[in-house]
């Protein structure tokens, strides 16, 4: 393998190689790391982050930045938990995605209509959204220990956490959209040349 090919390979697969090395090291250091229970816990704990990262694929593919994704997640979570405790758990579950959608739409308007660079727009909205989330929660954890509300994160199907199933479904749908639809081709086209 030539030096150029080696560099190209490392650029494309460096993250996967590092993850593999980390898994090997952790397996050698701990007998309990490479167990089904631990791996399921890792997947469950990282499912929300993986879903956000998958969604960020769309933003990055069109050549944008979204630094407010964490704040939007916080707003959706706080809204959902507050509604679950004070109004109705199902209303909390139903409205959380729409909160995220509305805030993301506001970002999109700031970027496309007001022509604010995505980096600056999302830094500003991140501060605003995070401030609202802290104000609504009064800076404290909102504990929603309601069975009808917590089944999505703590419940299991076929021995696997429901959140992991949601993550896998989300990844499959997004992969299909990006690789097999006109929408996906347009996303990559905009990322290649916004003016076109």
Map each language-model feature to its residues.
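Transmembrane alpha-helical segments of polytopic membrane transport and secretion proteins
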Residues: 1-14, 34
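Hydrophobic mid-bilayer segments of alpha-helices in multi-pass membrane transport proteins
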Residues: 13-22, 164-169, 190
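Structural signature of hydrophobic alpha-helical transmembrane segments
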Residues: 14, 38-50, 89-99, 164-165
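Structural signal for alpha-helical transmembrane segments and their membrane-water exit/capping regions
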Residues: 18-35, 62, 133-137, 176-182
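Single transmembrane alpha-helix segments in multi-pass membrane proteins
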Residues: 24-86, 109-116
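Membrane-helix/interface signature in polytopic inner-membrane proteins
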Residues: 173-196
């Amino acid at each position: 393998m030539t030096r150029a090919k080696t560099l190209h390979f490392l650029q494309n697969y460096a993250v996967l190689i590092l993850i593999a090395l980390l898994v090997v090291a952790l397996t050698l250091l701990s007998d309990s790391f490479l167990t089904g229970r631990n791996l399921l816990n890792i997947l469950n704990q990282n499912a929300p982050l993986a879903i956000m990262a998958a969604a960020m694929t769309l933003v990055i593919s069109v050549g944008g930045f979204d630094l407010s994704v964490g704040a939007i997640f916080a707003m959706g979570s706080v809204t959902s938990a507050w509604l679950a405790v004070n109004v109705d758990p199902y209303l909390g579950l139903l409205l959380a995605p729409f909160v995220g959608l509305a805030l993301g739409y506001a970002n999109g308007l700031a970027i496309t209509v007001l022509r604010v660079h995505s980096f600056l727009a999302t830094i500003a909205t991140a501060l605003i959204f995070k401030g609202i989330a802290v104000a609504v929660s009064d800076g404290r954890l909102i504990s929603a220990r309601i069975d009808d509300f917590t089944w999505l994160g703590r419940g299991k199907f076929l021995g696997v956490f429901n959140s992991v199933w949601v993550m896998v479904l989300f990844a499959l749908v997004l992969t299909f959209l990006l690789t097999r639809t006109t929408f996906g081709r347009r996303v990559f086209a905009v990322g290649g040349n916004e003016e076109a």
